[in-house]
């Protein structure tokens, strides 16, 4: 083997991601004046409010792209994207704190500009 050489088993073919999970296609527009980049595992319901789309159906979904990748929305740009449901326990914490727990039986917090920690 040569240092840095990659040996790939071509017999494996293509690797399919997120097989059997619910997906949805969505049109998203950036109404802001700056580019917005969204990472692969960011809870799409909680993305920057300058991105306009119907939010409610996106609870519990993320971008259907490989881990570590992102999609960039330029100002004024409209894109059609595909989302995939979160799997596992479907517990979502952090982001903008809109859902702090199980997405299927969540308690919704209000997304606001109030930065005070209580």
From Swiss-Prot:
It comes from Aliivibrio fischeri (strain MJ11) (Vibrio fischeri). CDD domains: Urease_beta. It is an enzyme of class 3 (hydrolase). This is Urease subunit beta. Belongs to the urease beta subunit family. The keyword Repeat does not apply. Pathway: Nitrogen metabolism; urea degradation; CO(2) and NH(3) from urea (urease route): step 1/1. Keywords: Cytoplasm, Hydrolase. Pfam families: Urease_beta. GO terms for biological process: urea catabolic process. GO terms for cellular component: urease complex.
């Amino acid at each position: 083997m040569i240092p840095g050489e990659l040996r790939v088993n071509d017999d494996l073919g293509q690797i399919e991601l997120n097989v059997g999970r619910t997906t949805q296609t969505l049109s998203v527009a950036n109404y802001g004046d700056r580019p917005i980049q969204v990472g692969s595992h960011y809870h799409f319901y909680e993305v920057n409010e300058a991105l306009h789309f119907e939010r409610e159906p996106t609870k519990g979904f993320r971008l259907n792209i490989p881990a570590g990748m992102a999609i960039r929305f330029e100002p004024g740009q409209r894109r059609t994207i595909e989302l995939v449901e979160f799997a596992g326990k479907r517990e979502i914490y952090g982001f903008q704190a809109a859902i702090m727990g199980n997405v299927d039986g969540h308690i919704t917090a209000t997304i606001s500009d109030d930065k005070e920690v209580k």
